[in-house]
From Swiss-Prot:
Domain (RNase H type-2): residue spans on this chain: 98-313
GO biological process, one term: DNA replication, removal of RNA primer
A cellular-component GO term for this protein: ribonuclease H2 complex
Family: Belongs to the RNase HII family. RnhC subfamily.
Gene: rnhC
Residues annotated as binding a divalent metal cation: 104-105, 208
Assigned EC number: 3.1.26.4
Primary subcellular site in the record, as a coarse category: cytoplasm
Family matches, as PANTHER family: RIBONUCLEASE, RIBONUCLEASE H2 SUBUNIT A
Pfam families assigned: DUF3378, RNase_HII
An MF annotation (GO) of this entry: RNA binding
Protein name, entry field: Ribonuclease HIII
Length: 313
């Protein structure tokens, strides 16, 4: 059995519904809009506007359906059982033209401070507003810009901020969790929270990729909401403004926690995990002790061991 998958627009999806045979639409799998049988082939239309035909002559049946609906496609997804990429053109999704949830995190590469994860819902209308406000890849923005921008967009967009503080981070590390697992759990939970906050239908959920989809789903510790609409994008901040917005809010939250550590310790600390961080950690050990240091840092980083060695010199 072969599978043929076509990526449709909203308008094309509606046309397909009109030409498909009537079928019972109760008890459909999550994310499925319509399912029927044609000439022994299973035809499934998803909420994500993907049309999948399963059967021996899936391509023939697919072309018949498209022709009947008056649709000519230049883009289609490859056969699910084929590794060939010849004669196939994959459409690059313009996420900002859709209602999207995007998620990203901050702090995962920093010895000091928590890990923050944010999911945000950005409608097509708000995407334009965020662009006017200057939302962009947060890696190109300084902390002051992040704070100013975050405080403008937080009231505008539905979002969920989750903070994994250092104590909880270290506890999960002791339980054998990797950072990838922590991220998967937090991203999935934040996305669920946002879905519960909004009433509008979501076209896509796009995650700034930190793991392949199979690994993400294995680690997420729960059902993946709107799985068929979920996409993973490398350098996602530059591809979806929903991810860029989440990145800004996540960095904003991280910066605020980072500033609180500086206030508590009276020591100017540095982001990242470089040699300067080792020296700063050693100063904190001298002032407050290793137990205190562990409450504001990620214990699994090598900076801890290096700081202890500096103390002994």
């Amino acid at each position: 059995m072969t599978n043929k998958v076509y990526l449709l627009t909203d308008e094309q999806s509606k046309k397909i519904e009109h030409v498909l045979p009537t079928s019972d639409t109760t008890n459909l799998p999550q994310g499925t809009k319509y399912r029927t049988k044609i000439s022994g082939h299973t035809v499934t239309l998803y909420n994500s506007n993907k049309l999948m035909i399963q059967g021996a002559d899936s391509e023939v049946i697919g072309e018949q359906i498209l022709s009947k609906a008056g649709i000519q496609l230049t883009q289609q997804l490859p056969d699910s059982n084929s590794t060939s990429k010849h004669n196939v053109s994959i459409e690059s999704i313009q996420y900002d033209n859709y209602n999207c949830i995007g998620s990203d995190e901050a702090g995962s590469g920093d010895y000091f401070g928590p890990m923050t994860v944010v999911a945000s819902y950005v409608s097509k209308k708000n995407a334009e507003i965020l662009k006017v406000l200057g939302v962009m890849d947060s890696k190109n923005l300084k902390d002051r810009q992040i704070i100013e921008l975050a405080e403008q967009i937080i009231p505008i967009i539905p979002h969920s901020l989750l903070v994994l503080d250092n104590i909880k981070y270290n506890e999960r590390k002791q339980m054998g969790w990797s950072q990838v697992k922590m991220k998967a759990v937090l991203h999935n939970e934040a996305i669920k929270n946002v879905l519960n906050k909004i009433e509008e239908p979501v076209d896509y959920i796009v995650i700034d990729q930190f793991a392949v989809q199979g690994v993400y789903e294995n680690y997420a510790l729960g059902a993946i909401p709107e799985r068929n609409k979920t996409k993973f994008e490398t350098k996602g901040e530059s591809k979806a403004i929903a991810i860029a917005a989440s990145s800004i809010i996540a960095r904003y939250a991280f910066v605020k926690h980072f500033e609180q550590i500086i206030k508590e310790t009276g020591i100017s600390i540095t982001k990242g995990a470089g040699a300067k961080v080792d020296v700063e950690a050693a100063k904190i050990i001298k002032l407050r002790g290793i137990d205190y240091l562990d409450t504001i840092t990620k214990k699994d980083f090598k900076n801890r061991e290096k700081a202890l060695k500096l103390i002994k010199k």
